[in-house]
Amino acid sequence: MRAEWIAKRRGQSNVSQMHYARQGVITEEMHYVANRENLPVDLIRDEVARGRMIIPANINHVNLEPMCIGIASQCKVNANIGASPNSSDINEELEKLRLAVKYGADTVMDLSTGGGDLDTIRTAIINDSPVPIGTVPIYQALESVHGRIENLTPDDFLHIIEKHAQQGVDYMTIHAGILMEYLPLVRNRLTGIVSRGGGIIAKWMLHHHKQNPLYTHFDDIIEIFKKYDVSFSLGDSLRPGCLHDASDEAQLSELKTLGQLTRRAWEHDVQVMVEGPGHVPMDQIEFNVKKQMEECSEAPFYVLGPLVTDIAPGYDHITSAIGAAMAGWYGTAMLCYVTPKEHLGLPNAEDVRNGLIAYKIAAHAADVARHRQGARDRDDQLSNARYNFDWNRQFELSLDPDRAKEYHDETLPADIYKTAEFCSMCGPKFCPMQTKVDADALTELEKFLAKDKETVSQS
């Protein structure tokens, strides 16, 4: 779809959407996004120029259907997939991708660390994906030195980052905010450093006693991103891994650095979003969102959860969707889903489905609470179908139509029950929605009540 759009940009030194927006240019991607979001295209351009919205759209991802991430648009959901050395392969990951897109993932991150040739897996995912693809290049950098963290060099990082950009990755998590001087701040944490990328960088700094190479070479990464229009997803390496560690000095120190890096990328017209926690008690979620907006000049916030309790392994798609809904309400732009397997193992296709639906619920609830234009229309349409016992329409409007129909048909599978004015919960005699009060009856009742009130007042 984008081949013709991109052809005229090739060879330019900066092809980012922010670069064009700041020149007053409205790109084809901006027009496409405006139509999807039902927003004025001038607003899209202005938000991208300001940095409050990104359109992750690598010029080498030609089959991408452009979307946006920002506070002015609908709250988005990311789904993580990826093969590991112990489980899964390319075919399983492609099936997860298709399921994620089917159930509404706005972006997908390939977090593969093994299970086959990483370049082959990534390229297949990009070529098969209509949604933006994100990656964490440090994983492949570590694999390239066979897990020997101390052998990694800045050039290793830059080589892998450019390779991902050339392959068409739309945004990358770059763990540039964790600095050497912040490492002692994790001493009093219960769970230390829980970011995989952050842990790799921390071990590198502890071994070499040198500053984070992603920080010292940040300008080199900017130059790569400009050439391909890759968006930064600035990784929160020191995000809290439990409630005890939430909003501590380590987390907030890194956040301040992420804000500085955001503005440095903006100086070169490179798009940025900022990643956030993690595990956060409900009473601290608003603070975390507002603090990010303050430190990072309102760059889009992209949070993992956050989980609001640590005691429910196997159900962390629920514990985190609670926090995600609140974070979205307070202004978070994109929610990274959590599956039931979080903290327990690699998610399978069914886990992807369950995690994604939980997060589509959270994002939609946030949009309704923020009074986004048209956000509640689908709710009202489904409620109308429910009141009128239009079962097939209810299924159609559901976030997961297959699951809704499956549960209905467990007890009433015959087609005749698709027009029945009851379900198996109440049966044919006790469903309250059968109580249809017509307008004439209400008019008569109002007359009676008015007359009764008049009689009482006269007495």
UniProtKB/Swiss-Prot annotation:
Enzyme class at the top of the EC tree: lyase
Functional summary from the UniProt entry: Catalyzes the synthesis of the hydroxymethylpyrimidine phosphate (HMP-P) moiety of thiamine from aminoimidazole ribotide (AIR) in a radical S-adenosyl-L-methionine (SAM)-dependent reaction.
Binding of Zn(2+), residues: 279, 343
Signal peptide, first to last residue: none
Lineage: Bacteria, Bacillati, Cyanobacteriota, Cyanophyceae, Oscillatoriophycideae
UniProt pathway: Cofactor biosynthesis; thiamine diphosphate biosynthesis
Cofactor mode of binding and number, as noted: Binds 1 [4Fe-4S] cluster per subunit. The cluster is coordinated with 3 cysteines and an exchangeable S-adenosyl-L-methionine.
Annotated substrate binding sites: 80, 109, 139, 175, 195-197, 236-239, 275, 302
Protein name listed in UniProt: Phosphomethylpyrimidine synthase
Listed GO biological process terms: thiamine biosynthetic process; thiamine diphosphate biosynthetic process
Annotated positions binding [4Fe-4S] cluster: 423, 426, 431
UniProt record similarity statement: Belongs to the ThiC family.
A Pfam family hit: ThiC_Rad_SAM
Swiss-Prot/TrEMBL cofactor(s): [4Fe-4S] cluster
A GO CC term assigned to this protein in UniProt: cytosol
UniProt EC number: 4.1.99.17
Catalytic activity: 5-amino-1-(5-phospho-beta-D-ribosyl)imidazole + S-adenosyl-L-methionine = 4-amino-2-methyl-5-(phosphooxymethyl)pyrimidine + CO + 5'-deoxyadenosine + formate + L-methionine + 3 H(+)
GO molecular function: 4 iron, 4 sulfur cluster binding; carbon-carbon lyase activity; zinc ion binding
Keyword vocabulary terms for this entry: 4Fe-4S, Iron, Iron-sulfur, Lyase, Metal-binding, S-adenosyl-L-methionine, Thiamine biosynthesis, Zinc
